[in-house]
C-alpha cells in the first residue's frame, strides 16, 4: 500500500511566492533561470522557518520544491516549458557562476578554518558562495564568509592575495586571510546551512583523494574534505613563497619573502630564529657547507702526517670499493715516518665498525647535527642568511659531514706525498 505524499499547503506557497518571486522585476520574472534562483531563496526560508515552526510540513529537496512552486504559479512558465528541463538548465548555469570565499589562517599559519554543511553527509570546505549580479569578487567573498561564519573579513582582505582554480568549469577564488586568532568566536548568520566550524591543521589535510593523512591523524576519510582538497597544495605553496623564511617577528610573518630549499608549514609558524634547526634556507646543502667551510680553511694542519692520514684513508676506501688500486712505493713509506701507529689505529677502528655495524637509526640521530670542537678563541661562522653567529666551545652545523668540516688544505703536505 502506497502512502500518500504530503504536499506543501497552498497558504505556505502563497506566502513564499509573495516574499521572493512576485516582487522581482518583470524582465527577471520572465527569465526561468532567474526565477529558479528566487525559488532557491524561498526553499531556504521554508527549511529555516516554516519547518521549524510548523510541525508536519514535508521536508523536500530543491527539485520537489521548485515543481510545487511552478505548479502553484503556472504563469511563471508562460510557454509551458518542461519543469525538469528548466531545472537542468538552471543547474548547468549555476555550475558556471563563479564562487568566491576565503581561506582563514590562524596566527601561527599552521591551522585553517573549515565549515561543514548542514546535511548529514556534508563534508568540510572553505566558506564561499556564488556571486550575485554586478557584485565585486572581494565583496562576494566577504558577504559569503560573514553569512557562513559570522566573521567580517572586509578589514583583512587583500585583493591580490588569493588562490583561483577552475573546478568542473566553475571558477572558484579564495582570498587568503592570515593572522586570525584561534579564540575568535564564529557564529553562522544563516540557518540550516552550516553545521560546524572548526580549525584544522594544514599538515593533516589531504592533498588528493587517495591521501590517507586525515584518516590516520583525524579519524576522517579523505572524501570528507573533497571540497577543500584542490586548494591544499596551492595553499602550502603560497605559504612557502610568502612566509618561507623565518624571522624574529612575533607574528611568524617574514619580511624577506624568499623561498627556502625545503619549506614546511611547521617552519612557517616559528616565531624566533633557531640557527641549529635551519634547513638550508638560502640554497642547496652544498652551498651551506661551503659557507661553513670557509673560515675553517684558514688554519692549516699542524703537521704533514695528518694530511697523509687523510689521503691514505681515502686510498684504503677506494681499494674496498673495487676501484683502481694504488701501491705505496718504498720511497713513500720512508717519508711517512710517523704514520704506522695512525695506520694501525685506522685498522682497529674499521674492525670495530665491522663488529658493531652502523644502524640506520644512528644515521638520523647522530648525523643530523655534528659537534665540532673549536679552539679557545671564538670563531665567527657565516650563517646562511649572512648574519655572523658567535661560536664558543662547540658549534652545531645542520646536516654536515664531519670529514668536510674538519678538512684543512695544506699545499706542502700534498706536494711531498705526491713526490713533486
Swiss-Prot record:
EC number(s) stated in the UniProt entry for this protein: 3.6.1.62
Annotated catalysed reactions: a 5'-end (N(7)-methyl 5'-triphosphoguanosine)-ribonucleoside in mRNA + H2O = N(7)-methyl-GDP + a 5'-end phospho-ribonucleoside in mRNA + 2 H(+)
Effect of residue 249 to D: Leads to reduced autophagosome formation under autophagy-inducing conditions
GO biological process, one term: regulation of mRNA stability
Entry cofactors: Mn(2+); Mg(2+)
Location of this chain's protein in the cell: Cytoplasm, P-body; Nucleus
Motif (Nudix box): 129-150
Pfam families the record matches: DCP2 (PF05026), NUDIX (PF00293)
Keywords, ordered alphabetically: Cytoplasm, Hydrolase, Manganese, Metal-binding, Nonsense-mediated mRNA decay, Nucleus, Phosphoprotein, RNA-binding
The keyword Phosphoprotein is annotated on this UniProt entry: yes
InterPro entries the UniProt entry points to: DCP2_BoxA, DCP2_BoxA_sf, Dcp2_NUDIX, NUDIX_hydrolase-like_dom_sf, NUDIX_hydrolase_CS, NUDIX_hydrolase_dom
UniProt GO molecular function: 5'-(N(7)-methylguanosine 5'-triphospho)-[mRNA] hydrolase activity; 5'-3' RNA exonuclease activity; manganese ion binding; RNA exonuclease activity, producing 5'-phosphomonoesters; telomerase RNA binding
Subunit structure: Found in a mRNA decay complex with LSM1, LSM3, LSM4, EXOSC2, EXOSC4, EXOSC10, PARN, XRN1, CNOT6, UPF1, UPF2 and UPF3B. Forms a complex with DCP1A, EDC3, DDX6 and EDC4/HEDLS, within this complex directly interacts with EDC4/HEDLS. Interacts with DPC1B. Interacts (via N-terminus and C-terminus) with TRIM21 (via N-terminus and C-terminus). Associates with polysomes. Interacts with LIMD1, WTIP and AJUBA. Interacts with DDX17 in an RNA-dependent manner. Interacts with ZC3HAV1. Interacts with APOBEC3G in an RNA-dependent manner. Interacts with ZFP36L1 (via N-terminus). Interacts with NBDY.
Family matches, as PANTHER family: M7GPPPN-MRNA HYDROLASE
The protein's name: m7GpppN-mRNA hydrolase
